[in-house]
Amino acid sequence: MTRRRIPGAVGLLAVLLLALTACAAAPERETVRAAGTPVKEVPAGAAIAPDRVRRWSAAEPVAVVIALHSFRDHAGAYDALGPWLADRGYSVQALDQRGHGTSEPHGRWPGAEPLISDVAAMVRAAQAEDPDRPIFLLGESMGGSAALASLATHPELEVAGVMAIAPGLRGGIPARGFWDAAVRTGEVLAGGLTLTIDPDYSDSLAPAAVERFSTDPRIIRRVRMDTYAGVVWLAQYATDHIGHVAAPVVYLWGEQDGTIQRESVCMAARAHPRGQAEVWTDADWPHLILHAPDWQTTAARLVDWMQRLAGDEVGARTARRPDPCDD
């Protein structure tokens, strides 16, 4: 097994291309699962183990927030945000998504279907526990892909709104065919290739987040190429089916984000079937916005957004295209 240390996703692809250029040409699209293939429900009974869910319960809850972490992270990402929201009346349920945290096999891609099925199961369970409480989805990066893909696949889910924090989306990516070919080639020819991802977050994230990514053994550091490919195809699925997400969405994106492009977020917002999508941007936000030093300010804005939705203000007002996307 080959192991190399690289700074991030772009470096991963660069190493991949160097390793595979002499091996073979990119396979035809038919040799791998097309990103747009409709996701099917996994068999019933695939229960979520209790130790995969962390809960912070509000004393008098006004709503439930189901939180979905980013790629390589786990439910402990919300050890600060969870109790902070609970103190303000929002019960939080954070899930170790499959292959992450306590979910085994750690670091292996389970497929899009199980991730989507888990989100649907979380929503349905929360509704069964308290049918009168609105449910919000909060997803960061890969978690944003999972949240959006789940609602696109299961439009019957009753969700009051989605907070998509730098979600994994791929609309408007320049030379996407080239990157797709690179990812497909790696997935097919070198799926077991392991690359070490160990970015330095010290200048962009809060100290607790820096410590977690540096020392927490539950963080995925050695990333398999087929796992990385699965994250990409999940993002593509969410992008291809974004027009089926009817719940109100607020998209957050920062200019310091080296992973997601603003145009990808803006295209998703424009595609909302009811015009109920907002885009917030900030010059200083990194990719992991909710783990930046000013995360409480951002969280307060999200609470305000949820309160506006609860008061029907968003649904009642005239749809408008978000200003950050008018450039």
Say what each PLM segment does.
Residues 17-57, 324-327:
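An N-terminal hydrophobic leader/cap segment in hydrolases
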Residues 62-70:
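Short beta-strand element of the alpha/beta-hydrolase
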Residues 71-75, 101-130:
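Catalytic nucleophile-loop/oxyanion-hole region of alpha/beta-hydrolase
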Residues 82-106:
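Conserved alpha/beta-hydrolase
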Residues 138-224:
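Alpha/beta-hydrolase-fold enzymes
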Residues 245, 251-253, 257:
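Short beta-strand/loop motif that positions the catalytic acidic residue
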Residues 247, 261-270:
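Short alpha-helix in the alpha/beta-hydrolase fold that links the catalytic acid
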Residues 276-278, 282-327:
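Catalytic active-site module of serine/aspartate enzymes centered on a nucleophile-bearing elbow/loop
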